[in-house]
Every structure is written in structure tokens, then in C-alpha cells.
Amino acid sequence: MKVYSIGRETGCDIVINDSTDVISRRHAILNVTSMGKMTIVDQSHNGTYVNGIRIAPNVPVPVTRKDSVSFAHVARLDWNRVPKSGEAIKYAS
């Protein structure tokens, strides 16, 4: 399984540039199995949303590339930018 950290901290795998500090340093985790199944886990104070519904903190929620995933309603996950080979990327909302 690959685990991708998402947040405003520069050490995250997917970095969200957020000058308002609404995005947490480590906002969420995206887990991807070797079979391509994915879950997202909210680790923030301001929430992670899947298809407009706030998910419970620290509970893995199944997602697909067709789902809309947003962070504190200020940034959306661009599925085309999810790392495919484990490299860190920069993601600007």
C-alpha cells in the first residue's frame, strides 16, 4: 500500500498552497492499495469533504477518481496530480 500525505506542510506528498492557514499542515491521508483501491482519511480541524459531504475524522472512506474531494472547502484534489510513482508533488488550489 502507498500512503500519500496531503496538507500545507512542505514535507507532504501533495502540498496545498494555502495562505489562509485553513488547510492543516497534515490535512488528510490518501491510501492506495496495490489493486488500485483508495481510501482517504481526514486528519484536520476544518474538514475533508467527499462529494460535498464532510467525512468523519480518522475514519478511512473509500474514494475513486470520479469522486470530488475537497479540503476545508478551499482546495480540491486534482486526481490527475495524484502521484503514480511515489514522488512528492506540489499542488496549488
Where does each model-flagged region fall?
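C-terminal boundary/linker segments immediately following FHA domains
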Residues: 2-7, 15-17, 29, 34-37, ...
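Short coil-to-beta-strand transition motifs
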Residues: 21-25
